[in-house]
Design a protein with these regions (language model features):
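Formylglycine-dependent sulfatase
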Residues: 1-339, 344, 353-374, 403-422
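Residues forming the ATP-binding cleft of Hanks-type serine/threonine protein kinase domains
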Residues: 350
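A contiguous, mid-protein "functional segment" used to position or interact
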Residues: 363-398
Length: 422
């Protein structure tokens, strides 16, 4: 969706076993058609370097393992899926160095080299560079100095933990059961190490982003370069006893979205946006166009217009652990979570930004629920999309030899990074 500006149900690339291969044109292809140099450094998580994915050069790319992805996780029915024995967050949690922190350091160094080389070339042609850093993705291992920034006594309390009586939504309970990272902590102290490590990885990420921005300035490009900073998803970090992404709560679906550069006024835009807006943003910035979803708009255009707090933002999930399709609609103060075959959730993000109280069963909000359901149906038919996702995943699984063979395909956890020599 980030590459193409189309929703998941439009691309039909439902999960990590269906990585992007460039067959659906994206913003990179639009730039290539305009003869704009476009390169990438770092994590892409696409299928393979050989695919025409919209980059002239892909420097040290991290792709899905073996060009296949987590096929085992595409088996989503409760009576068929596998429950991994390992721990998603990593066998060890705490201060240290991992393959991912080494990789991020390499991506940062390669980006610094790229800017220096570009500046030395005296090439004045416009260019586009995508940089993909991994942190704060698990394993939750972070260099000591960043881990030490977050002593246990300063960590915020985890909200809505099941041990305090909170009952998860049935869909969420079934999704989480496939991994259940919370249940695999050996002690409460290890759980605190995980939280401190996650925050430390965020600071490690900030450190690398800072080095990249300093290199951009040193190279002389800062004043005439537009920079966009974002992420593909958030993380629950223990809220509701959940870790990772894979659900529709704000901790999981919210991402930073910062754009800075020439002719971009400082400030905050109150119009909701999503990752699919980036396709049109990048293409239009270079005078190109892209056949993206009708719902996409350029961030520059959105920022210049009057705020539209009621603009609809949509998300969906059909991947690891999802026993049925899950769909999110954000409109104004309202957040609507639709689960095929399960009761919905409704939150008032203005009065309840932490999503503590589900209003879906409150008769006082019945009309709001109906309106949001109608808005969702204008984007897609959840039942039809859910059926299509299961059908496409079943077809893919059969192409690999059936469920027994599929259960053995793909990385068991975090994708291994490439070996890098600088």
């Amino acid at each position: 969706s980030f590459a193409t500006g189309r929703y998941v149900h439009q691309t039909r690339l439902w999960d990590n076993a269906m990585p992007y291969d460039g067959s659906i044109p994206g913003w990179g292809h639009a730039l290539q058609e305009k003869k704009i140099p476009v390169e990438s450094i770092g994590k892409l998580h696409y299928r393979a370097e050989e695919d025409p994915a919209g980059f002239d050069v892909e420097h040290i790319p991290m792709m899905v393992a073996g060009g296949v992805g987590m096929v085992w996780a595409s088996i989503r029915k409760e009576d068929e899926r596998v429950y991994p024995k390992g721990r998603m967050l990593g066998d060890y949690i705490g201060p240290g160095i991992s393959k991912y922190t080494d990789y991020d350091a390499a991506v940062t160094a390669r980006t610094q080299q790229w800017f220096a080389s570009k500046a030395a070339s005296n090439d004045t042609q416009p260019w586009c560079l995508y940089v993909g850093l991994v942190a704060p993705h698990f394993p939750l291992v972070v260099p000591q100095e960043y881990y030490d920034l977050y002593p246990f006594s300063d960590l915020p309390a985890v909200k809505l933990h099941p041990k305090n009586g909170y009952q998860r939504h049935p869909w969420v309970e079934k999704q989480n059961a496939m991994m259940d990272s919370e249940a695999k902590f050996e002690t409460d102290e290890e759980r605190l190490r995980a939280i401190a490590s996650y925050y430390g990885l965020c600071s490690w990420l900030d450190h690398n982003v800072g080095k990249i921005l300093n290199a951009l300035e040193t190279s002389g490009f800062m004043e005439n370069t537009t920079v966009i900073y974002t992420s593909d998803h958030g993380d629950n970090v223990g809220a509701r006893g959940l870790w990772g992404k894979s659900n529709l709560y704000q901790e999981s679906v919210s991402v930073p979205m910062i754009m800075a550069g020439p002719e971009i006024a400082p400030g905050t835009c109150d119009t909701p946006v999503s990752l699919i807006d980036l396709s049109k943003t990048i293409a239009m910035h270079f005078g190109a166009d892209i056949a993206s979803s009708n719902d996409t708009k350029s961030l520059a255009e959105i920022a210049k217009n009057a705020p539209d707090p009621d603009r609809v933002v949509f998300s969906e999930y059909h991947a690891v652990g999802a026993v049925s399709g899950a769909f999110m609609l954000r409109k104004g103060r309202w957040k609507y979570n639709h689960y095929v075959g399960f009761a919905p959730e409704l939150f008032d993000l203005k009065d309840d930004p932490e999503e503590l109280v589900n209003l879906a069963d409150d008769p006082a909000f019945a009309s709001t629920l109906v309106l949001l359901q109608s808005d969702l149906n204008q984007i897609c038919n959840p039942d039809e999309v859910n059926a299509q996702a299961f059908a496409d995943q079943a077809t893919m699984i059969e192409s690999y030899g059936g469920p027994e063979a599929a259960l053995k395909l793909g990385a068991p956890g975090a994708t291994p990074p490439p070996k890098v020599t600088l």
